[in-house]
């Protein structure tokens, strides 16, 4: 019944198993992949005919985590998986990026890749396994895919690279780098690092590339026995159309790409496009020699060629810069004075308005995942409204691109943030892209660094980011610093590098062609470092280090520690005590399981009142100390006084006043505020208090009484 095939290798100290022919047999390609005890299913389905009326490749990648994979039931009313989580979105992008450039150019059949996590051993992250499984499923499917692709995660501990570190090892590593590619080329890199030098980052990329070669060999071995017949697909030969179109618009496009202003350049390009449409798709014609899709495809290819020729032949770019120059930069801080921290970072025609907000433990984000619930104290949200590129468009929840760009900036800044013990605030940063012409994610990095420092967050060092590009033809290549949007679309490689003056904190690389050597990547990284240092210098003109104190409108947080066995006393039955403290002092209070108490308010008096209240609950009163209390009950033999948090004590009638007292209520009534001295404890541990040794006006001890006590003791 089943035509089952299986390949198994040892990889990174664990077995990697690829199977096909038993599950999801109606898909074009399906692979069940196991690494350790983590299991994923990858499937590929591609339409038999191209999607009409489009000039792009309609590829969709969906990565999904099923909660049953970790033995859990989803939360919420419906108890089933809902919209994709942030991680699912990010892993979908991670899988998409290395496979997309490997489809044969011109293939436009609707294609969907679905990867489902079926089992998680809580040691091996499913993301790398999912990339491998997707590559294997595509290789078996028969679609025109020039793979297979391998992938690996690289850690860095004690000066040594680690292949596919376990989840518990990730806490120790100074690097979390994912690399993917073919047998002879790196295609994609995604990473977070703790200020590592460029040579260590490049070494990690090459280490990963070498170590995923056995995976590629295993996929090929499986394909040799299980792959479907390749689909017949011949890319269209549009060279004749290209030659004709060059005659019509080459001069117009060359002139258009000499215009430095983005909108004016787009107007000129659109005029050239209209000229092409008139020449090849005239209105009223009964039939066309070329289809609208073919004309659009060739026009787009011509744009790329003309830009690339200009750069390689003249060393001059679209906006007139040379290869290494960074666009003019203006950095400003404190632009929204009532917010906790703000900055506007402008680089050429790209601009980010970034605002930092400080919150308390109540504002932490709880993220449910297969490995458990994680508390996030740093959030970075990137928004790309359509007006930033002079267009109308959809508004609403963030798309995959916005989530991905936000996470890239998050990775760049995260290693420089203070530990929660040093800075017990929840931080949310929002980056609004108000203008865009390339490199908006790196503008977000720069703006975030400035906004955090403006808010008084003790960032270890300023962070900057730069987007780089590469154009390669045969043996000639050009590395471009601070690329424009057009250079991003028309180039062969774009990579984004963020970090401090000392090292790299984030590296993202996407390579669209083969033949990018280690030497070319080294040149590109060194050029990116020069650009990053220049940007840091420009940022320093606005703010070079964190302000010494928090903004006027930011909350203040004081941290205190209480014994864990006292947590119950502070919270009270059903939360009664802590609610009363919050209501009466106005401060926000967060208590953690280890006894850490965070008290927050924009008013210092509220914090102090809450701190004293909590201290009075958990501390023990000291013999000989004077306390202010409230009479809570009177009796024939004395008065009970609440003097230390919830603790009451008896002032015997003989201790109410220096003179003889006939009746307790002659001296005090319920509700009176009094000063008492803790004299000690009786044999049953009951508190003994005295009022007569304390001046009830000043709260000071009566010295004469002390002398008499001393004389009595000596006598």
From Swiss-Prot:
Main location: cytoplasm
S1 motif domain location: 624-692
Catalyzed reactions per annotation: RNA(n+1) + phosphate = RNA(n) + a ribonucleoside 5'-diphosphate
Keywords, sorted A to Z: Cytoplasm, Magnesium, Metal-binding, Nucleotidyltransferase, RNA-binding, Transferase
Compartments, as annotated in UniProt: Cytoplasm
GO CC terms: cytosol
Matching Gene3D superfamilies: GHMP Kinase, N-terminal domain, K Homology domain, type 1, Nucleic acid-binding proteins
Name by which UniProt lists this protein: Polyribonucleotide nucleotidyltransferase
Gene expressing this chain: pnp
